[in-house]
């Protein structure tokens, strides 16, 4: 085993190897609170309970304590008992976490290493590992990488799982340590069946093959070659599922089903409200709304989704492939796998910056997850809407320009994959 180094920990949050977090304005930083110690996993069929043996004012303070042990338990829905999955223990040891071969030694970042042990009660190793990583990353938001010493009888199994899934890699300078990568986790690497945030991949979670396709339309004006798009999940399917810690509730995106009265009634009520109509301008009869949803369902480039909090409808959003979208001709430069989003929050009880941001982040996350070739997700809200400051404040995206579209003047937002994974508020 490599001896512990005497180098002091690196405190500054912007040093190499530490996460370049996107910070809202100072008065808004309460948004980053972690929430409960118990949370539901994607799909809402299992939950995780986290016990930290240190009393502290925040998760960061607990992790900073000299000695900290984190025990992670897992339970399936409907079961009275849970089983202990894994244990994290903070080590009295520093390890290099900045990028090896890139950062000079005098600038290198050293952080406290942790041990990870899969417990004997862990009857499903893959779920235990995933739950343990989830429980840790939501609390350890400072770093892109974490140095880990694998311990216990299942250490070899954990090591193989992490390496084969791409969740981490062997430390180049300390032979007994591995380095876990935060961004790989939030891309869904190694997620067991049913626990991926993307709940309904069609036809599979693998890459859909490149097949040349063509779209021609006069209203809106479209004349574009682009990749053939994969089929969408069936209406009513859960597309995306994630527990949102700042709100202590579970968010889902469900493919809207025009034949489902709950879906249709909520959608029509929202679009016919004066507040939503100010932004979307889709007020009208049931026939008009049914036609709109049906056309979206028949359109291979767009998918409408309901936003639900703990199963209660809250809003409506859209995920579109941008290359063949109606606004592409007016903004230019969109790639084959670039995507775009639209969002409205219809229910008053689910409004506010915390929930709106969580919904928008989830839509963007779903876009990046459904095709790893997507490098950019764009948005083009009308320039005078009051959501513009929220979008600029709570998402790490850039305002590219204001652009004239046939039906509105819009602010053109561009969100890049690498920045979203590094700085997006997913914890």
From Swiss-Prot:
Q: Is Transferase there in the keyword field?
A: yes
Enzyme Commission identifier(s): 2.3.-.-
Q: According to the record, what induces this protein's expression?
A: Expression regulated by iron through the urbs1 transcription factor.
Query: Which residues does UniProt mark as catalytic?
Result: 380
Does this entry carry the keyword Transferase? Answer: yes
Output the superkingdom of the source species.
Answer: Eukaryota
Pathway recorded for this protein: Siderophore biosynthesis
Keywords carried by this UniProt record? Acyltransferase, Transferase, Virulence
A single GO molecular function term of this UniProt record:
N-acyltransferase activity
List, in alphabetical order, the GO biological process terms annotated in this UniProt record: siderophore biosynthetic process
Positions binding substrate in this chain are: 342
Recorded phenotype for the gene knockout or disruption: Impairs the production of ferrichrome A but does not affect the production of ferrichrome.
- InterPro entries on file: Acyl_CoA_acyltransferase (IPR016181), Acyltransferase_MbtK/IucB-like (IPR019432)
Q: Where is this region: Disordered?
A: 1-24
What's this protein's family per the entry? Answer: Belongs to the lysine N-acyltransferase mbtK family.
Q: What is the protein's known function?
A: Acyltransferase; part of the gene cluster that mediates the biosynthesis of siderophore ferrichrome A which is contributing to organismal virulence. The first step of ferrichrome A biosynthesis is performed by the HMG-CoA synthase hcs1 which catalyzes the generation of HMG-CoA and CoA using acetoacetyl-CoA and acetyl-CoA as substrates. The enoyl-CoA isomerase/hydratase fer4 then catalyzes the conversion of hcs1-produced HMG-CoA to methylglutaconyl-CoA.
The identity of this protein, by name, is: Acyltransferase fer5
The record lists the organism as Mycosarcoma maydis
């Amino acid at each position: 085993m490599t001896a512990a180094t005497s180098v002091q920990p690196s405190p500054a949050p912007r040093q190499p190897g530490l996460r370049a977090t996107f910070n809202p304005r100072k008065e808004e930083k309460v948004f980053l609170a972690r929430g409960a110690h118990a949370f539901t996993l994607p799909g809402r069929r299992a939950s995780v309970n986290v016990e930290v043996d240190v009393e502290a004012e925040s998760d960061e303070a607990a992790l900073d304590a000299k000695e900290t042990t984190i025990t992670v338990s897992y339970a399936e829905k409907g079961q009275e008992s849970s089983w202990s999955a894994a244990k994290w223990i903070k080590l009295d040891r520093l390890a290099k976490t900045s990028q090896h071969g890139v950062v000079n030694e005098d600038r290198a970042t050293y952080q406290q290493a942790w041990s990870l042990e899969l417990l004997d009660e862990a009857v499903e190793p893959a779920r235990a590992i995933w739950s343990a990583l989830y429980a840790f990353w939501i609390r350890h938001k400072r770093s892109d990488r974490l140095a880990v010493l694998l311990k216990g009888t299942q250490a070899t199994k954990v090591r193989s799982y992490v390496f084969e899934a791409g969740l981490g890699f062997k430390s180049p300078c300390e032979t007994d340590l591995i380095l876990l990568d935060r961004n790989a986790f939030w891309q869904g690497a190694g997620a067991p069946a049913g626990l991926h945030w993307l709940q309904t991949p069609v036809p599979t979670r693998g890459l859909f093959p490149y097949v040349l396709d063509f779209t021609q339309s006069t209203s809106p004006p479209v004349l574009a070659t682009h990749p053939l798009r994969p089929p969408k999940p069936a209406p009513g399917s859960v597309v995306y599922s994630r527990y949102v810690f700042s709100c202590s509730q579970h968010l889902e995106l469900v493919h809207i089903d025009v034949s489902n009265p709950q879906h249709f009634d909520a959608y029509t009520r929202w679009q016919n409200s004066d507040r939503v109509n100010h932004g979307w301008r889709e007020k009208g009869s049931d026939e008009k709304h049914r036609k709109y949803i049906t056309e979206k369902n028949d359109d291979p480039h767009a998918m409408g989704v309901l936003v639900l909090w703990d199963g209660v409808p809250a809003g409506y959003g859209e995920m579109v492939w941008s290359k063949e979208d109606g606004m592409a001709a007016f903004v230019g430069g969109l790639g084959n796998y670039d995507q775009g989003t639209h969002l409205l929050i219809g229910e008053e009880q689910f409004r506010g910056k915390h929930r709106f941001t969580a919904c928008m982040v989830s839509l963007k996350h779903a876009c990046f997850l459904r095709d790893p070739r997507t490098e950019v997700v764009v948005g083009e809200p009308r320039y005078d809407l009051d959501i513009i400051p929220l979008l600029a404040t709570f998402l790490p995206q850039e305002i590219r320009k204001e652009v004239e579209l046939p039906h509105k003047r819009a602010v053109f937002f561009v969100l890049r994959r690498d920045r979203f994974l590094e700085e997006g508020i997913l914890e």
